[in-house]
Amino acid sequence: MFNFFAAAPKGFEYALAKELETLGAENVRESVAGVYFSASLAQGYQITLWTRLASRIVLILFTGECQSAEQLYNAAYTIDWPSHFSNRSTFSIDFHGTGGFINNSQFGALKIKDAVVDRFRDDDLSRPDVVKGHPDMRIDAHYGRGKITIGINFSGAALHQRGYRGNTGEAPLKENLAANMLYRSGWADNPVTLLDPFCGSGTVLIEAALMACDIAPGLMRERFGFEHWRRHDQALWQQVIEEAKARASLGKTRCQLKFYGSDIDSRVVALAKRNANSAGVFDFIDFKVANALNLEPPVAEGMVLTNPPYGERLGNVTSLLQLYFQLGEKFKQSYGGWKLGLLCSDMELVSSLKLKADKQMKMYNGALECAFNLYTLHATSTRRDIPVDTTGQGGEIAAPFANRLKKNLKQLEKWAKREGIDSYRLYDADIPEYNVAVDRYLDYVVVQEYAAPSAIPEAVTKRRLTDVLLALPRALGIDPDKIVLKTRERQKGTNQYQKLDGEKLELVTTEYGCSFKLNLTDYLDTGLFLDHRLTRKLVGEKAKNRDVLNLFAYTGSASVHAGKGGAKSVTTVDMSNTYLNWAKDNFMLNGLIGRQYQFEQADCLQWIRDCERQFDLIFIDPPTFSNSKRMEDSFDVQRDHVDLLASLKKLLRPGGEIVFSNNKRKFKMDMEALAAAGLKAVNIDDKVLPMDYARNPQIHNCWVVTHG
């Protein structure tokens, strides 16, 4: 008997142990990311050829304590390497694990390499060559918890590489993961008609057909690791191969099952057909190009087993949520009596199915942790176009939110047209349970999620946000691809809600005759603060024949209004070169070209101290708080506003005005200190609060400051 280790991804251990027992393994013991077992040489060959789950099979030659580099070397040296492979064979070492005296796997591999080479030399043999590419012999070592296990990679290249895929690059779904889905779903024990509506290159269906036809997954492989092992029994191996071929031939004649696969992409369907043909199961699988949402079940009962798109495989999160929701509706409407097994890495997407799982399991697709959920599908008469409420109270998904949104849209759409604007706020946490802001930018909608109170469970906030995104397209009559989601807190884990496929989404919006460039995806803000719309307009109305200064200018939108309003000159100052370039683009959009328009990159507070010019109109919208590394001092608008305005006094000509705005809630102007500085201020909040922000009057405050 020989001792082996079958390595596999995490989450495979239970199914792999059962498979190994079925294949005749003895002393089967589950471990992390693999299973230990004992087997005869014939059984070892059989398992290597037939395992559908293992990534590699290692023939163990040594296991023992290892607390130092010397012990590691000695452990490797005790193995009689010349009895296992020739000095004319090339070899490599795959070392797994770190800790203790082993800081990195390369150090462990070098120690074992030294021991192997020395063992050959001490046996009066020339040393074998080490190669990285395709060695004749792979030595496998694993270190953990003070123990070292050294062996020979019995199987060779990764076993999930069956040989039917060809050189098509990295697959979204590895073959052994597809096999594990088949095992854990119960399909392998009770084969039924199988459908994959997102079949991609056909992996799930091909693996299922190989099982149904009793075809060993290793039959298509050209090489195995044991072929250069000196104790390899070629006659015995050939016998195992011939038996497998006979079983495959018989299995294909007996298989009565039919498999169905579809994908919306004709190119991957063509690839799936080629792969199925290479695997010898083309005749058992019906592939076609189709949209999963329009696909009807081919028979009355069966199983859907699939890995739908998620994350970067499709793009916009709202489109994904809608896809999963509509998929759940399709399953409920058309697939009553079927079973469903679904693999996905994003639980928000899974929850959008609105299906109750019978069982939930964890699997890994490479390094990506995924949920594998099993469902029993029951027929319903739910209308496809009305999302189902998750509150248990009936009606639409997020019905209060959807109704409020429709009401706001009806009021604001006509108003915006009269005002000559096409970007405005539709919803601002009007209903506390749906704690988001919804802004319309032409045909697009940006959703900003506010951080929820700590008392509300994260699962609740995630569900509500998901429901908001599901309700939006229908409530506003827009395509899901037109919705962009932003969050006001740091992204965690596998959350994909940041960009649309990593591509810029730029638009041009108009506002009271001015045009502005927007970027809806690359930054937390879009380039235009909608709540300052009337403040910008006011700056434009006050700018005629005046020298205007815009500080903390962001993308220069107030400067554009000043230029369009007939300013004699406009000076735009901001610390960010990115935003200054954006401001220049906005000036170009509006035909504002000339030396009278100046752009200066600087710490605004320092710039004020250094400036020797004077202006007739100054617009300043400082941050509520800043401690940027590029600024010499920290800034707090409540603490420092008087000093700030006093420093601007020397820049303000007699008869000039400062339009001072900030977004600090409960801000209090220190009128006494301001008067002592020779200035006076008049609050104009009621004049510059736009209608679309009337629900939130504390969004910002605004003052006109003049010489006292």
UniProtKB/Swiss-Prot annotation:
Keywords recorded for this protein, A-Z: Cytoplasm, Methyltransferase, RNA-binding, rRNA processing, S-adenosyl-L-methionine, Transferase
UniProt subcellular location: Cytoplasm
UniProt xrefs under InterPro entries: 23SrRNA_methyltr_KL (IPR017244), DNA_methylase_N6_adenine_CS (IPR002052), RlmKL-like_Mtase (IPR000241), RlmKL-like_Mtase_CS (IPR053943), RlmL_1st (IPR054170), SAM-dep_methyl-trfase (IPR019614), SAM-dependent_MTases_sf (IPR029063), THUMP_dom (IPR004114)
Principal location listed in the UniProt entry: cytoplasm
CDD domains assigned: AdoMet_MTases, THUMP_AdoMetMT
Taxonomy, superkingdom: Bacteria
GO molecular function per UniProt: 23S rRNA (guanine(2445)-N(2))-methyltransferase activity; RNA binding; rRNA (guanine-N7-)-methyltransferase activity
Cellular component aspect of the GO annotation: cytoplasm
SUPFAM superfamilies on file: S-adenosyl-L-methionine-dependent methyltransferases (SSF53335)
Family: Belongs to the methyltransferase superfamily. RlmKL family.
Function summary: Specifically methylates the guanine in position 2445 (m2G2445) and the guanine in position 2069 (m7G2069) of 23S rRNA.
Protein name: Ribosomal RNA large subunit methyltransferase K/L
Organism: Shewanella amazonensis (strain ATCC BAA-1098 / SB2B)
Gene behind this protein: rlmL
